[in-house]
Amino acid sequence: MYDPMATAMNLVPMVVEQTSRGERAFDIFSRLLKERIIFLTGPVEDGMASLICAQLLFLESENPKKEIAMYINSPGGVVTAGLAIYDTMQYIKSPVSTVCMGMAASMGSLLLQAGAPGHRIALPNARIMVHQPSGGFRGQASDIERHAEDIIKTKRRLNEIYVKHTGRTYEEVEKTLDRDHFMSAEEAKAWGLIDHINESRDEADEKA
């Protein structure tokens, strides 16, 4: 089956740098990692979460006081994988700024609003979508009941995280997340998911 994400990753360009020891070649994402820039793109799943968490922990070990920039373009994905990234963002000492380019939906929106206060950014044409968790399970009635109880607990926990970072009341969050709720960058700012909408690098530097 054709996988556009895999195809794109196979076309990642290389960057050649001159050093005192000669030339060194980096893929573009590794080169940006040297500048403390992380890309969270595509569906949020366990493999991606491991890579993102490892990058966050590595950059913290390099300089715990220096900011890390996380660029997000994601349709969301697995809740547990997203919460692993969220917890690591909160756990490390380095402040993490978040930038939405394209789309931050579902778990992507939760990670966007989890950036350091004052450093949550969207580009002008970014779209943000929030909603409650979804899932499915087949099995014995008692097992289905337990899974239903667990997803309700998960829903409550995710709502509490949105409350913490947006300043909205629990009731407001629960009502907004009841169905797929799409927002423009301006609407996301008004709702408290982001702090700034930046059209240019100069504008971002002025607000830094």
Curated annotation (Swiss-Prot):
Subcellular location: Cytoplasm
Keyword 4Fe-4S: no
CDD domains given in the database record: S14_ClpP_2
CC per GO annotation: cytoplasm; endopeptidase Clp complex
Residue numbers annotated as active site: 106 (nucleophile), 131
GO molecular function, one term: serine-type endopeptidase activity
Pfam families per UniProt: CLP_protease
Protein EC: 3.4.21.92
Family named by the database record: Belongs to the peptidase S14 family.
Described function: Cleaves peptides in various proteins in a process that requires ATP hydrolysis. Has a chymotrypsin-like activity. Plays a major role in the degradation of misfolded proteins.
Assembly and binders: Fourteen ClpP subunits assemble into 2 heptameric rings which stack back to back to give a disk-like structure with a central cavity, resembling the structure of eukaryotic proteasomes.
The protein, known as: ATP-dependent Clp protease proteolytic subunit
Organism: Caulobacter sp. (strain K31)
Gene: clpP
